[in-house]
Amino acid sequence: MIAVEEARPSVDASPGRSCPLHYRYRPEDFAVEAPAHLQGLDVLYVVGGLYGNALALERVLELFERETGRKRLVFNGDFHWFDADPDTFARVQRQVLMHEALRGNVETELAALDADDDAGCGCAYPDWVGDGVVERSNRILKRLRQAATPEQQAALAALPMWQRADVGPLRLGLVHGDATSLAGWGFAQEHLQDASHRETVARWFDRARVDAFACTHTCLPVFQALTADEADGAEKRRWVLNNGATGMPNFAGDRSGLLTRVAVTPYRGPERRFGIVTGSGTVHVDAIGVEFDPVAWLEHFRRDWPAGSDAHTSYFERITKGPTYEPREAVRDVAGQPLSCRLAAHSTSTR
């Protein structure tokens, strides 16, 4: 893998692999105060990769309703995807936009005025993703455009690409992709296995002046630890918090989605899959299982995407079996090695 300091135009400019210039921002953009309504939070839910799963959305809202204190729910992109039925599309968008929302590549391309835009699905897929997946994703996006009204497209276009939030003492950058692009793969679990790339990510944190980035986009969850030296010589732990997907399974044999919960109190329910403690022991970060009826969801999915359709070909196996990935792989120390779920549950930063 080649680590890059800045997001640069993809060598492959083909639809679905390119990363358009208007997707980009700088790590320095995050070195600002959070807006007032996202400061001093007790609980923050970050929901990425909902993918038009209305049943998962209902479950997210139920879980969030249980929370107390100063709380906010943020959908950080790709909340549309499988919702090709106009009624479902409208319901998903209406409920999502009642809360804080960012646009991912899906929403950005849905909002594009030029339906022939060469970005395709805007996924900026890396080279380990096959051409067939890329081509099918481009066609899924093209079909999804037919479900959106001009008014809905305008609402999507108005959404920001990133945001800042504070939970307790923790400064978070909220993104869809990574610290340089809404479709960046710099926070993918595959890339974060590479030591030189983790050094690049650490420099992004230095420039962004945040303690954590909460992200999604790359479809597999990872909580990756990074360290930074403080002026007084102490070591501070920072985190990439990637929830994988809320609307699809994230682990083999577990058909639940995941959301990232960042809070000043621990999560006590059985939905918790893994987590860490940071902010000098004051902030709990957990991956919460979004448990919806898998049979009902599969029936809904098949109505819009029957066998032989692009989404069915690309996603049916994952929806029914989950990816070849385990919870023990999802929480990693500064060397990129997995932490046990027990250690991850009790680990704290040194600052």
Model-predicted regions and their roles:
Residues L44-V46, L73-F75, A101-L102, G173, ...:
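Residue-level marker for buried hydrophobic side chains located in beta-strands
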Residues R70-D78, R139, S181-A188:
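Short, basic, glycine/proline-bearing loop/turn elements
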Residues P86-R164, A195-W204:
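Active-site neighborhood of divalent metal-dependent phosphoester bond hydrolases
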Residues I2-Q95:
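N-terminal active-site segment of His-dependent metallophosphoesterases
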Residues A112-D117, G186-F187, D254, L298-H300:
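Short aromatic-enriched loop/helix-cap "lid" or pocket-rim segments at secondary-structure transitions
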Residues G49, G77-D78, G104-N105, H176, ...:
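Active-site glycine-centered loops adjacent to acidic/histidine catalytic or metal-binding residues
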Residues I2-P27, Q39, L226-R351:
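Acidic, His/Gly-rich catalytic cores of divalent-metal-dependent hydrolytic chemistry
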Residues L144-A287, F292:
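Acidic, His/Gly-enriched loop-helix segments that form or flank divalent-metal centers
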